[in-house]
A protein has these predicted regions:
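Folded, non-transmembrane soluble domains that reside on the lumenal/extracytoplasmic side of membranes
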Residues: 1-149
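Juxtamembrane interface at the cytosolic side of transmembrane helices
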Residues: 148-175
Length: 176
């Protein structure tokens, strides 16, 4: 009934969330010139009519949230986006925020909002090769493996012969 960047057929968002999201997406479009649109669907889907309704072009991104598949998020990406964010970015974005574990922990609304937030960060920066932000689990895993690797290297490098400062042979043998 009014021009909107959000069509919430699946009722993923509360009225307040939808209103804030509409304002945010309109503001991003005014500020950057890039169109971001959100469609949530379940049983009912507008199909290809949505392209004409929103006038999607090469500077448009359509995020489709549909829980019927294995991944909540799908993206219809305008060609101009690929100059700033490669195809691998969109795959990473989909797998990070649309997987069933993330959706279970953050809800469908959180997954959509977080994915859009990552895109907005990249639009502000002007370019992204990878999705910004590091999940806590990945950060902890990286820290743990780094510390463990340091301990192994330290023990391996400990001199075994008198006059030797570093046991290079053992260090190289046990290094990854």
């Amino acid at each position: 009934d009014h021009p909107t960047p959000v069509i919430d057929l699946a009722r993923v968002f509360s009225d307040t969330q939808r209103g804030r999201l509409e304002e945010s997406l309109d503001e991003v479009e005014e500020r950057t010139g890039w169109k971001l649109r959100v469609l949530t669907q379940y049983e009912r889907t507008p199909g290809l009519a949505i392209r004409e309704f929103w006038g999607l072009d090469e500077r448009s991104l359509l995020l489709v949230a549909d829980p019927r598949g294995g991944n909540l998020l799908n993206f219809n990406v305008g060609d101009a986006y690929f100059a700033m964010m490669p195809r691998t970015y969109w795959v990473e974005l989909q797998t990070r925020f649309g997987n069933q574990y993330y959706v279970k922990d953050h809800g469908e609304d959180g997954a959509v909002l977080d994915a859009l937030g990552a895109v907005e960060i990249c639009l502000e920066r002007g370019r992204c090769q990878v999705v910004p932000g590091l999940p806590l689990e990945q950060w902890l895993w990286t820290l743990t493996t780094s510390v463990l690797g340091g301990l192994i290297a330290g023990f391996a490098a400990y001199p075994r012969k008198e006059g030797e400062t570093v046991a290079w042979a053992w260090l190289l043998l046990l290094s990854p």
